[in-house]
């Protein structure tokens, strides 16, 4: 069964909706963005998340110190890193790691010490997709997430195309820039039950 990560949550109501609907991962964005939360805000929201739902912190080109502070203060289960990744960034972290990879047409998949890879559009969180034909996941060492422009209408096709470990959505479950609780529920329902969208 493909797992689901709902990313960019910043309110109690959205976290509760995602958890009750069956999300496997909840993502908190610590990088500058309209979805950014502070460590203190994330720590409060994390109290609403049961142990079987994993808490993910999202960072852009962080230092190891930043990661360790967030892991400690929020109780993160995973860190997801976009941008520059130092060679030793993921070594001996007290939690699992995800390295984000922008799919930009060159088909390059980096050698990574991360536990998981996440394939995203060139501009993460934009709602834009990438050309699925540009990504060959054959022979990958790590389980991988698919992100980038996913929504309730195309997520089943993405799962059929890639057979990923998990799918990741943020803007695809928003209306007017805010998390839409019905869209969160429908997205998870489609993933868990394989119901194709209308488009």
Swiss-Prot record:
The alphabetized UniProt keywords are:
Amino-acid biosynthesis, Aromatic amino acid biosynthesis, Isomerase, Tryptophan biosynthesis
Q: Which InterPro entries match?
A: Aldolase_TIM, PRAI_dom, RibuloseP-bd_barrel, TrpF_fam
Q: Name one GO biological process term.
A: L-tryptophan biosynthetic process
- As recorded in UniProt, its EC number(s) are 5.3.1.24
Spell out the reaction equation it catalyses. N-(5-phospho-beta-D-ribosyl)anthranilate = 1-(2-carboxyphenylamino)-1-deoxy-D-ribulose 5-phosphate
- State whether keyword Isomerase applies: yes
Q: Write out the GO MF terms.
A: phosphoribosylanthranilate isomerase activity
Tell me the protein family, please.
Belongs to the TrpF family.
Q: What is this protein called?
A: N-(5'-phosphoribosyl)anthranilate isomerase
Name the species this protein comes from. Answer: Streptococcus pneumoniae (strain Taiwan19F-14)
What taxonomic ancestry is recorded? Bacteria, Bacillati, Bacillota, Bacilli, Lactobacillales
């Amino acid at each position: 069964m493909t797992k689901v990560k709902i990313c960019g949550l910043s309110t109690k109501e959205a976290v509760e909706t995602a958890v009750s609907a069956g999300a496997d991962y909840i993502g908190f964005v610590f990088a500058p963005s309209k979805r950014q939360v502070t460590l203190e805000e994330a720590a409060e929201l994390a109290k609403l998340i049961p142990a079987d739902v994993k808490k993910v912190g999202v960072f852009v080109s962080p230092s190891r110190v930043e990661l360790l502070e967030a892991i400690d203060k929020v109780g993160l289960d995973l860190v997801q890193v976009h941008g520059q990744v130092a060679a030793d960034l993921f070594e001996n972290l007290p939690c699992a790691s995800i390295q984000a990879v922008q799919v930009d047409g060159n088909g390059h998949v980096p050698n990574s010490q991360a536990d998981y890879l996440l394939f995203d559009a060139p501009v993460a969180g934009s709602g834009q997709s990438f050309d699925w034909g540009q990504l060959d996941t054959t022979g990958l060492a790590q389980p991988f997430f698919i992100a980038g422009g996913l929504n309730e209408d195309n997520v089943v096709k993405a799962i059929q195309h890639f057979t990923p470990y998990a799918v990741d959505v943020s803007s695809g479950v928003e209306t007017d820039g805010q998390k839409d609780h019905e869209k969160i529920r429908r997205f998870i329902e489609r993933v868990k039950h394989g119901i194709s969208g209308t488009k």
